[in-house]
Amino acid sequence: MNDEDQDDKTKELPLGKETEANLFKSRSIFIYGPINQELAQKVCSQLVALAAASDEDIRIYVNSPGGHVESGDSIHDMIKFIKPKVWMIGTGWVASAGALIYVATPKERRLCLPNTRFLLHQPSGGTRGMASDIEIQAREIIKMNERLNRIMAAATGQPLDKIDKDTDRDYWLSAEEAKDYGLVSRIVTSQADI
């Protein structure tokens, strides 16, 4: 490795730390990418740290294809658990377990950018093994689906039977459709709108 390569690597590290410090100061968290245990641990730690630092509002930007439901549950529950108010800003796509996290705040604090797309659907699982184990997993997925649909119905104001029907297959919504559906309170185009 030559000196120029070393200088480039050295320059990258402080920028990352500086960005993290600025995000902490601005009380902003980014949930970008798949929802998994590692992301849940990071986001929950950030939420607890921000709550310990101050009661000021927190902003969470969500752009996720979804992922592990239980990891989404832990973020969803932690958002409700901490004292500061949390604002959700959807961007890109807010799908599946990402939508579960997104609805952790009251509707009036759920915003999105104009080109955000939302995806609601039933959870899926891949299991194999003995028939009795597959049956157990199927029952658990059905219970999870019922629980998630109750959460989504409460968050949107839609009747549970409509949520059941809509999430039976992939249900895509534009930002405007998500607003009409009750997922989003406002579509924003700048930080000044928040």
Swiss-Prot record:
CDD domains: S14_ClpP_2 (cd07017)
Keyword terms, alphabetized: Cytoplasm, Hydrolase, Protease, Serine protease
SUPFAM superfamilies the record matches: ClpP/crotonase
Broad EC category: hydrolase
Domain of life where this protein originates: Bacteria
Subcellular location: Cytoplasm
Presence of keyword rRNA-binding: no
Primary location group: cytoplasm
GO cellular component, one term: endopeptidase Clp complex
GO aspect biological process, one term: protein quality control for misfolded or incompletely synthesized proteins
Record-linked PANTHER family: ATP-DEPENDENT CLP PROTEASE PROTEOLYTIC SUBUNIT
Subunit structure: Fourteen ClpP subunits assemble into 2 heptameric rings which stack back to back to give a disk-like structure with a central cavity, resembling the structure of eukaryotic proteasomes.
Described purpose of this protein according to its UniProt entry: Cleaves peptides in various proteins in a process that requires ATP hydrolysis. Has a chymotrypsin-like activity. Plays a major role in the degradation of misfolded proteins.
Name this polypeptide is given: ATP-dependent Clp protease proteolytic subunit 3
Organism: Rhizobium johnstonii (strain DSM 114642 / LMG 32736 / 3841) (Rhizobium leguminosarum bv. viciae)
